[in-house]
């Protein structure tokens, strides 16, 4: 599997196709986001490690340029070292991506902590300095005040853009921004 991924990466580099990795805490909606923007079904379940391997889909950006989006395994706090090693090949996609899309579950009371955990893991992997868009997902499930508070709490941690949306509903003011 590792050899196959390496071959696929070399082909992407040869074709000069931009890549983005969808990262975030487990059950934040990463696979659902990939399904939404690619128009193809990606398995998404409300359970730990529903995604065990990467899934990549090619989308076309509004200006016609192709982009390869890769769904990665969800992060969890205090991930045992042996699991980090087991998921290394899938986590490697974040390191090799041109930029990252971090999905944060706005309805989770631990949303900020999960966001910070994801940043810590990305830093440990050597991907913490990648350009990033943060998707504040499931905003349809939280009051407007909570959404605003979350955006305010996340803003100091990074210099990118926070995109509020509901992946499940397929809407939100940020949906068009996801198409970078």
Protein language model features and the residues they cover:
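Conserved G1/Walker A P-loop phosphate-binding module
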Residues: 1-77
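Flexible beta-alpha connector loops of hexameric P-loop NTPases
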Residues: 41, 73-83, 105-111
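Helical "lid/switch" subdomain of P-loop NTPase nucleotide-binding domains
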Residues: 48, 83-86, 114
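Conserved alpha-helical scaffold flanking the Walker A/P-loop in AAA+ ATPase domains
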Residues: 55-58, 86-91
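Active-site glycine-centered loops adjacent to acidic/histidine catalytic or metal-binding residues
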Residues: 71, 137, 166
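Conserved C-terminal guanine-recognition region of P-loop GTPase G domains, centered on the G4
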Residues: 88-160
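Conserved AAA+ ATPase "SRH/arginine-finger" region at the nucleotide-binding site
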Residues: 164-170
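Conserved small/polar residues in nucleotide/adenosyl-binding loops
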Residues: 178-180
């Amino acid at each position: 599997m590792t050899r196959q991924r390496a071959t696929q990466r070399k082909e992407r580099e040869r074709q000069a196709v931009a890549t983005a990795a969808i990262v975030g805490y487990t059950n934040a909606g990463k696979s659902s986001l990939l399904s939404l923007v690619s128009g193809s079904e990606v398995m998404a379940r409300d359970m730990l490690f529903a995604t065990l391997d990467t899934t990549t889909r090619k989308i076309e950006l509004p200006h016609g340029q192709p982009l390869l989006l890769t769904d990665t395994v969800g992060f969890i706090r205090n991930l045992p070292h042996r699991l980090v090693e087991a998921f290394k090949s899938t986590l490697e996609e974040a390191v090799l991506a041109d930029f990252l899309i971090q999905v944060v579950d706005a309805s989770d009371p631990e949303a900020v902590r999960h966001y910070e955990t994801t940043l810590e893991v990305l830093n440990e992997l050597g991907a913490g300095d990648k350009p990033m868009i943060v998707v504040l997902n499931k905003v349809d499930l939280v009051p407007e005040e909570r959404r605003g508070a979350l955006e305010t709490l996340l803003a100091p941690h990074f210099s990118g853009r926070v995109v509020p949306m509901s992946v499940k509903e397929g809407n939100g003011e940020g949906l068009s921004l996801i198409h970078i």
